[in-house]
Amino acid sequence: MKVVDKIKSVTEQGQTAFSFEFFPPKTEDGVENLFERMDRLVSYGPTFCDITWGAGGSTADLTLEIASRMQNVICVETMMHLTCTNMPIEKIDHALETIRSNGIQNVLALRGDPPHGQDKFVQVEGGFACALDLVNHIRSKYGDYFGITVAGYPEAHPDVIEADGLATPESYQSDLAYLKKKVDAGADLIVTQLFYDTDIFLKFVNDCRQIGINCPIVPGIMPISNYKGFLRMAGFCKTKIPAELTAALEPIKDNDEAVKAYGIHFATEMCKKILAHGITSLHLYTLNVDKSAIGILMNLGLIDESKISRSLPWRRPANVFRTKEDVRPIFWANRPKSYISRTKGWNDFPHGRWGDSHSAAYSTLSDYQFARPKGRDKKLQQEWVVPLKSIEDVQEKFKELCIGNLKSSPWSELDGLQPETKIINEQLGKINSNGFLTINSQPSVNAAKSDSPAIGWGGPGGYVYQKAYLEFFCSKDKLDTLVEKSKAFPSITYMAVNKSENWVSNTGESDVNAVTWGVFPAKEVIQPTIVDPASFKVWKDEAFEIWSRSWANLYPEDDPSRKLLEEVKNSYYLVSLVDNNYINGDIFSVFA
């Protein structure tokens, strides 16, 4: 979806749109750390995020890779910067074709900074001289597919700012006229260069309107987190620093925490003034850190850490090809990135109902599904690599996870448990102690308000429902006992399969069971989570392989603990259990 349309949708609901900018880190570890920060920031619901291109086009390939993961794995509407620096038309078109094929629809068109080692911008042979040329090219070749954003400079472009820190009136007006040419050529959004004097920004907006620039103008807000970094960035951009800001920072310039706290306060006051003058969007330059951006938005009342809203129980895709997707199997609830990877080859995605046409189309397992950031790998090492002398030791690790003592799980990409798990974590702890090793669960919910903490989704005004669900590993003996007991509970349905594909079930192999649904005003019933036997058979290969790839392999090859985990993998069953009585059922009764 185009960013300008998303901003319009948000502001028409009387809300303030906000967004975040990131840049490509220099190291592989830095990239993985960035994705973890992105995940946290995206949970607050930004309208979009953007990723920079890098000075002189130096990070082109990495920017393309990060942009694709942002759109398709982090699931946030992504805008990619694209510059003219060192970019002949062939490379520009390659970049545009790449992001289009990855479902990205938004570009920030820039001239770019001079190449490394040069003071002035130099047009590369076969390339463009300015952002206007780039806008014209994108519109000419790609029509209306891309949303095009351009940069606005409240104090004029740094190239025309004089030694005294000011642009001449003629240079300023010329800069405005050039901005209008970019908009007239097809740009539909303006994001500004950083500034610290809000009066300058407000004058800039008014001046734009006076000459017929009517598209949204989004202020770029750069939080101050480090004094030297602040001076360096302001100097590079030739940004005016108000006297009161200098006076406030000078006494605390050597105290980074004090500078950061004041930076949050100052940016908050800037934003309050901007919003009070009718501006409805904010763009935060994060510098790849999250605390200042979160602090500003919390001060403004735009986010509340205790009330993070969800449009669905899982993060809605941003890829233009998946925007209508609203149904998924519950099995990947804790591994959404793996699910996206295994379904990226689909031409159509379930909308409204699951149907039975997709089960055979999952991609095969690859190393990607088991790759982990080093930070998460370290956490698993710390929490899960202990001597395992018996199955009781294995059960104890699962119990610790369920009662909240562990923050990682080999079977989850998430940090800690889902918030709703706290409702049933005591019961989960008991059944894990008894040999039912849970990896996925949800409590029953009957007509809870859709904005309820922990279990709500879909926004206010609706009601949500859930059937209780448990997914666990257990021995054949325990499965046999469970099957026998379940005969006294007609509302319970189950499926079980082992690594050798021995199948036990009391449901039909084509029976799809909706286990989460919501009812909202003037809408059809939404059922975003289902249990599907065909998908369960696909998931079981991944679930069993995790015993080896994500846990046993953390031990030395000849370690007895590793041998025990492999024995569990090869002998246990994976079980999916649903209590279809969501009104007064008790899924844990069958374990009594």
UniProtKB/Swiss-Prot annotation:
Query: Per the record's keyword annotation, is Transmembrane helix included, yes or no?
Result: no
Q: Which residues are listed for FAD binding in this entry? A: T52, W53, H81, R111, G112, D113, Y153, H157, P158, D159, V160, D175, K182
Which protein is depicted?
A: Methylenetetrahydrofolate reductase (NADH) 1
- Pfam families found in the cross-reference section: MTHFR, MTHFR_C
Q: Where does substrate bind?
A: D113, Q193, Y285
Q: What class of enzyme is it?
A: oxidoreductase
The residues annotated as the active site are E21
Q: What PANTHER family does this protein map onto? A: METHYLENETETRAHYDROFOLATE REDUCTASE, METHYLENETETRAHYDROFOLATE REDUCTASE (NADH) 1
Can you state the subunit structure given in the record? Homodimer.
User: What cellular component terms from Gene Ontology apply here?
Assistant: cytosol
Molecular-function annotations in GO? methylenetetrahydrofolate reductase (NADH) activity
Q: Report the function annotation for this chain.
A: The probable reversibility of the MTHFR reaction in plants suggests that they can metabolize the methyl group of 5,10-methylenetetrahydrofolate to serine, sugars and starch.
Q: Which reaction does it catalyse?
A: (6S)-5-methyl-5,6,7,8-tetrahydrofolate + NAD(+) = (6R)-5,10-methylene-5,6,7,8-tetrahydrofolate + NADH + H(+)
